[in-house]
UniProtKB/Swiss-Prot annotation:
This is Uncharacterized protein YetA. The gene is yetA. It holds the Pfam family PcRGLX_2nd. The lineage of its organism: Bacteria, Bacillati, Bacillota, Bacilli, Bacillales. PANTHER family: CONCANAVALIN A-LIKE LECTIN/GLUCANASE, TAT PATHWAY SIGNAL SEQUENCE DOMAIN PROTEIN. Transmembrane segments: none annotated. It comes from the Bacteria.
Amino acid sequence: MKKIKWLSGQPKVTSGVTWGMPWKKGELKKGDRLALMNENAETRYVQSEPSAYWPDGSIKWTKHAAVFGGQENQSFTVHKREVPQPTESLSILETEHDIQVDTGALVCTIHKTGSDFIQSLQINGKPIAAGGRLVAIRETRKESAAKMVLLHERSVSFIKRAAIEQSGPVKAVVKIEGVHVLHKTYEEWLPFVIRLTFYAGLSEIGLVHTQLIDRSGKLEFVKGLGIEFDLFLEGEPYNRHFRFAGEKGMYKEPAQLFGTRKFNERYPLYEKQINGEMLSPDEEHKEWFAHGTQNAVWDDVKIVQDSSDHYSLSKRTGKDYAWVGMLHGSRAKGLCYAGGKNGGVALGLRYFFEKYPSALEITGLAGSRPKMTIWLWPPDGEAMDLRHYTGNTHVASAYEGFDEMRSDPTGIANTNEISLACFSHMPSDEVLNALADKWQAPPLIVCEPDVYYESKALGVWSIIDTSHPLKKELEEQLDAAFLFYKKEVEQRRWYGFWHYGDVMHTYDPIRHMWRYDLGGYAWQNNELVPTLWLWQAFFRSGREDIFRMAEAMTRHTSETDSFHLGEYAGLGSRHNVVHWGCGCKEARISMAGLHKFYYYLTGDDRTGDLLTEVKDADYALVKTDPMRAFYEKGKHPTHARTGPDWAAFCSNWLAEWERTENSEYLKKIETGINCLKRLPLRLLSGPTFEYDPATSMLHHMGDGIAGGYHMIIAFGAPQVWMELAELLDDWEWEDMLSEFGEFYTLSDEEKRKKSGGALHDGHFHWPMFAAGMTAYAARKKQDPHLAAKAWNLLLEDKLSHTPLPIKPERIETWTQLEELPWVTTNTVSQWCLNVIAALELIGDSLPAKKETSGKKG
């Protein structure tokens, strides 16, 4: 039996939910049936499948789908038992040309080719919508001294492949892949991937849309990017209605307003019209109708979120007439509705203000075929600019990676979550508002922290324990670190289509500003793995705010900081002013271990794609050698450091092995480990090797050579390797990890002696980064002296680079700010990860209480 609960309260409206949960080794076998039980001991069907396996073949992670009514129970349990039949099932039928999904409340027919992915949407046997064509507007520029000419060309989607990925009975998923095609030249550009998700009994569709960039962005600019739906609405203009979700509720109007000079807001039917009641002319009100039908018909209406703090609503009577401003607001909830006598459609875009600019538009509302467009990048503002910020690399002055200019967006992606709901009647404001809230923060079922911890399915980390005074102090500091970044996202407005989810690298206390404009000090791009810190913080706490930040960071870093096609496919881009700007393209940024927990917790299929994408990322190093600035090509195809390169490969291979049980990826891990075992210094060798992806072999070049020993451990290698140690049953591998952790803390003299003179203090920078590995060594050796060294690395300010307490200062500059003058995301991420590990491994060896409540950090 497993206890599960809602991440943030039960949904207010009926919702389809997919979630994941871990299992102890041997606890769940293939073929075991699972059922869901609520607090009233009522059992229901849950669609279940494995998403990862233990080495013995038992199930490590499962993925589940179920439909929950509004005001559901707060908690549930999952049991191993015979599964009851689902009360509602969907059906799916595939033909040569289309795929039809019938949820019982909605019938959706999906094209397998052409421009529109939805052939029809039907409610109660009647069509309500169709289309679903993707729209991209290309901008090209011709500039002279006297003028600039902008050319805007419209392109629409062309479907290349549509396939059923899940077929029920509770949940169905259809994956669609294609490109945009320009009208005039038929040129293809901007590949896309869309998944449509359906749940039994629901008249909703979830869309996960991924836009890939296949151009450099130097000559062609994306002016607009959206998805357009056709509506089949019935009724007169005065019975056509729109709704937009503002900050608190719905703004609503009809296409033709019946407030007139003679019959104003005091007229009793006027309020009914505004509230969406259908009007029928009769003898009593015929004069009102006669006046009202002479009013302007407002055919087009849109809401544009042009910054994280401003949206505007406007309307016009047609494309040949001016837009009239309606209202302004701060942060819209990203939902619009258009409907008539026969019902209508609601569309929603998640992260509507966070990933500005964004827009929702209704055109031709009063006509025979209205359109609704969800703009991921609205054409109202500036075109998307993917160019680099400079013509130089600024390596020496600004911490850029290489002298080579490799700032290229080709291969990056951006994924967005869109929702669509169909109605056979006018929905109430309460229903639409509940939908808007649900679509912005989708309901999710999670486990209690002790379930994650006891499963041992997530590597090495500690459960929260405040029984010891210093443990309590450290938990307060871990919480303070997270809260600082949570507030900083809002304070610094780290929002935007290409930015949301990321944080900045290093702070400038003189300008009271992050180094947003200084080469490698700007966006973090997963450097020193803050994503791992956030996921471990969530597993320990179960907190929604931590989950949401980890989710946003995972979505951003896995898509925008990584490359999915082109020369750098499988790699990611190091920290820079522009997310794809650094000359370093590295496996450490895109490694599976940074993203797999989101996949396991949510069952997100797009993230599953990304884990598969990187399984053979080591081959990308043949074209982009990470050590090309230091070494010429040798006998073997490329070079790799044990960390971060080979450690990232291990992470990728582990994810592929546990997800698919493909033992070839286990062999790749074992091959590298065995290469290291044969060397006198084992894991301390190198750290740079010649590498052959065809054999997965590391070829020794020497010890203490270029590569940097702190680089081995700063990018998630300890977390990956300790997780592997739990799985491999290889005592020598465990001993190698222990040896590395102990060696980092030795004196210079001891390092030279133990390595035969090859290694010394000059090779081992940033010892705090090794605190977790040192704690691992202390635990394995039962060595209190080593444990004391590890804690000293974390608690002594000069070594930890994290002055305690973490207590922001309030200052007055161009505005009032809270700041940590010393802060870098590198050190905070690593300090938190190493503290979390040390609390697990040597939590019983804590020193006397350290005072962290007086001085400012």
